[in-house]
């Protein structure tokens, strides 16, 4: 038997302030973990078997996102974050600034930790410029909005900036597969920042400066429900918008979710004019600018632009007989109305975060009916 090698040992608390000498090895007796020291970093660097740390993403606070907005165009990764990249553990012992590209308003950015120890943002969701999917690991992202969130109940401004509630990481994110274009509402659920666009099959359900889907410009038919990728639905009925949201792992909001996501919009006010055809842009002939309808959470055109279908039924009941109003998919008996929320451009003082219409059947379709998606909040261990 060879002579045993012994290391100095100490508790986790003792290790917290111990820097040791360069290349010194100690044992954390509380965690039964080997710790390597560099002579400068308090606490050193705990080691574990590679098969146990592969794909590791560790945060100091599991209940919070790993990033902090530090300015309109700046953000940092939080101290205590540890990320495995290309077989290496990258540890951030202090809040570290994220290297930013030139940011473009209305764009989503992925955040990568790279095997050279840097953290950077990029609009490419496969790999950042100068790196590959092997040498850089996507760990989160954010939306660079065309204006601010509401500070009170009067909407936001038009200064482009990072929406702090859009920050997400791989363990703190929307439950929907694609986190882009979403914002966290009151820590409870995620909402699409923008109204649904016509070309959701390629754009997703929430994208800046695209044609809004409504009763006069209906969305492309879901390829999961019989669509061919190019044909659109015949109208803007509730059935079709609800089907689109299901396609993307989302749903239409209920009344409580809507009043929450729209909080901060300018109340009792509508866009005016003759139409609101584009996300994040003033309506045609608008008397009120798009930004005054931004909510506290950064939901754009939250009210006063289009009535948006809700995920609730009630109000006026249908006829006490079977009615074939489902697009050839069965008949309904005494069906109540499908809810609509928020108010449209022609609603004058009727619009707001609690504005609701409980009159329209789910087969109704008008140019001022649109939709916005929501989904659950996901926190992973």
UniProtKB/Swiss-Prot annotation:
Predominant place of localization: virion
An annotated GO BP: symbiont entry into host cell
InterPro entries, per database record: CTDL_fold, Mtd_2nd, Mtd_N, SUMF_sf
One cellular component (GO) term of this entry: virus tail, fiber
UniProt keywords, alphabetically: Host-virus interaction, Late protein, Viral attachment to host adhesion receptor, Viral attachment to host cell, Viral receptor tropism switching, Viral tail fiber protein, Viral tail protein, Virion, Virus entry into host cell
Compartment list: Virion
Domain of life: Viruses
Keyword tRNA processing in annotation: no
Keyword ATP-binding on entry: no
Domain notes: The C-terminus contains a variable sequence in which nucleotide subtitutions can be introduced at 23 sites by the DGR.
Oligomeric form and interacting partners: Homotrimer.
Function according to Swiss-Prot or TrEMBL: Tail fiber protein located at the distal ends of the fibers that binds to the adhesion receptors on the host surface, thereby determining the host range. The phage can alter its tropism by modifying this protein. Variants are expressed through a diversity-generating retroelement (DGR) that creates mutant copies of a template repeat and replaces the end of the tail fiber receptor-binding protein with these sequences, thus changing the host range. Milliards of variants of the fiber receptor-binding protein can be created with this system.
Name the UniProt record assigns to this protein: Tail fiber receptor-binding protein
Organism this protein belongs to: Bordetella phage BPP-1
């Amino acid at each position: 038997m060879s002579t045993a090698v012994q290391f100095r040992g100490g508790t986790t608390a003792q290790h917290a302030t111990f820097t040791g000498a360069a290349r010194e090895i100690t044992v954390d007796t509380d965690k039964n973990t080997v710790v390597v020291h560099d002579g400068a970093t308090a606490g050193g660097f705990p080691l574990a078997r590679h098969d146990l740390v592969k794909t590791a993403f560790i945060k100091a606070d599991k209940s919070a996102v790993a990033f902090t907005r530090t300015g309109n165009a700046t953000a940092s990764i939080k101290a205590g974050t540890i990320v495995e990249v290309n077989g290496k553990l990258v540890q951030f012992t202090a809040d570290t600034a994220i290297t930013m590209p030139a940011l473009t308003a209305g764009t989503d950015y992925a955040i990568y930790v790279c095997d050279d120890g840097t953290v950077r943002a990029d609009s490419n969701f496969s790999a950042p410029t100068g790196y590959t999917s092997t040498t850089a690991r996507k760990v989160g992202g954010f939306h660079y909005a065309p204006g601010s969130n509401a500070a009170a109940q009067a909407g936001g401004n038009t200064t482009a900036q990072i929406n702090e509630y859009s920050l997400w990481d791989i363990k703190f994110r929307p439950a929907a597969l694609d986190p882009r274009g979403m914002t966290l509402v009151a820590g409870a659920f995620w909402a699409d920042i923008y109204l649904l666009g016509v070309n959701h099959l390629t754009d997703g359900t929430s994208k800046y400066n695209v044609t809004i889907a409504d009763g006069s410009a209906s969305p492309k038919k879901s390829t999961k429900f019989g669509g061919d990728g190019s044909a659109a639905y015949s109208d803007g009925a509730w059935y079709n918008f609800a089907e689109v949201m299901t396609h993307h792992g989302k749903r239409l909001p209920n009344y409580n979710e809507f009043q929450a996501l729209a909080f901060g919009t300018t109340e009792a006010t509508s866009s005016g004019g003759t139409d609101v055809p584009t996300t994040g842009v003033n309506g045609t002939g608008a008397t009120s600018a798009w930004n005054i309808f931004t909510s506290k959470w950064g939901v754009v055109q939250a009210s006063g632009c289009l009535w948006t279908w809700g995920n609730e039924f009630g109000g006026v009941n249908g006829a006490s007989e079977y009615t074939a109003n489902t697009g050839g998919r069965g008949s309904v008996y005494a069906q109540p109305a499908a809810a609509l929320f928020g108010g449209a451009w022609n609603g004058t003082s009727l619009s707001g975060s609690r504005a609701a219409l409980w009159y329209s059947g789910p087969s109704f379709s008008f140019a001022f009916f649109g939709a916005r998606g929501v989904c659950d909040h996901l926190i992973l261990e």
